[in-house]
Amino acid sequence: YHTYRIPAIVRATDGSLLAFAEGRKAGQGDSGDIDLLLRRSTDGGATWNQPQLLWDDGPNTCGNPCPVVDRTTGRIHLLMTRNLGTDHEAEIIAQTSTESRRVWTMTSDDHGVTWSAPRELTASVKAPDWTWYATGPGGAIRLRNGTLLVPATHAAQARRREVQGKYD
């Protein structure tokens, strides 16, 4: 990878540290072939495993990792976004891109060793008039009532940006 960006780190219920980041293949830009990566440490960060590829969608952009650990169940939720690698932020916001930015999740029930396949959440978290959506940066939190509060930004009707957080 040429560049690593948008880091996020959480501690699993077994004490493992999980560090997520985008792996940008062609350069520092925010579009293109971008994969989602994970490195784990089981010794408090003294050593780290080799990067684990969590999501490679070919030439497309997979990123904005936003993890949260449910301390009650131990499940780790990873929220993220995906768009065509040929679509750029300004085009997505202006609705001149080929596709829109979409929202996805993956989960792990074994402290980040293995992960579910990506599952799309766009319809439940992104309003129809929102053109842009980005999870994070950083991590989310679990409220006492079990709600996962995920930081995110969006642009609505190609004019304004707002902050939003929601995920059940």
What are these regions (language model features)?
Residues 1-168:
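Asp-box/BNR beta-propeller blade signature and adjacent active/binding-site loops
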